[in-house]
Amino acid sequence: MILLVRYNEILQLGFCMTTQQSSSELLISTSENRTALTTDVQSEHVNAAYAYLATLHSENSRKSMASKLNVFSRWAGFQDLRDCEWDRLRPEHILAFMASREKKGQRGSTSNCYLAALKGVAKSSWIAHGMNHEDYLRINALKQRRYYRLPTGRSLSYSESRALIENCDLETSIGARDKAILSLMLGCGLRRGEIPFLRLEDYEPKNRALTLVGKGDKERRVFLPQPVAESVNIWIEHFRGTEKGLLFGRIFKNGRISLGDPLDPSSVGRITKRRMEEANHEKATAHDLRRTFATRLLANQVDIVTVKKMMGHANIATTAMYDRRGDEAMQAAAEKAVL
């Protein structure tokens, strides 16, 4: 079987290959007895970092991991990930690098991201027959750092969320759009990175349902509470229109709505920040609206398995990290303990 993986997206991450390589394609040939990693360039050598980055589905993940691999490369004495000798990577190098970073105050979560990136490169090198099996196993055996930090972010109060929504003027296109966006994050738990790619044809007004592709390229169906559906319907019926395409788009100063000019996740973050400031509330991020959604479901006795599905999480442990009920929930639970 031949799997064809193009480097086009990887080349947009802020680094480049040689002219000869920039048009190359990565060919992964597999058979029962062996796995060979080659390119259409004359050299048989494959940069394991490029091969690893090609396996990542998210553009943000590729950018983040490429940045970390560049940091490691410079620490190891190379210019960047392009000329780092990845096939010679050993666990001792990784441990020394991690120790030097943590000595400067690097957090455990960041260390684990570096470790994941370097393990991924080691695996790509091993697949390409660059790194021997023993060295790969030694690197793969490195354990993640154990750490605990108090959870960041917060859950909005009901008065805050009401004021946030009511502050949007439905007489204007910007107000109607922003109310629909904020309602989807508060009432459906959507990520800010999911908002820009919602499409009208995936919305079912009669069923108050919306199908989307979220983090990790996972498709899920969300159901809109009545107030959320009303906000979305007002945006569509009074401003957006019913033509197929992106559900939300940019709105220019002259009032023109451009559905061919999508929002980006940072734009959704700025909308949240601006609306919170206009409502004179404590600072909150777009992700805090998602935390609010999960916290309220759990507070209303929705089982955590259902909440996990509604959030689009892969495991319950991730969902539990969104719980911001605080000491009040534990005090109420303590009253139910039976001696």
Residue ranges and their predicted role:
Residues I2-L339:
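Conserved catalytic core of the tyrosine transesterase superfamily
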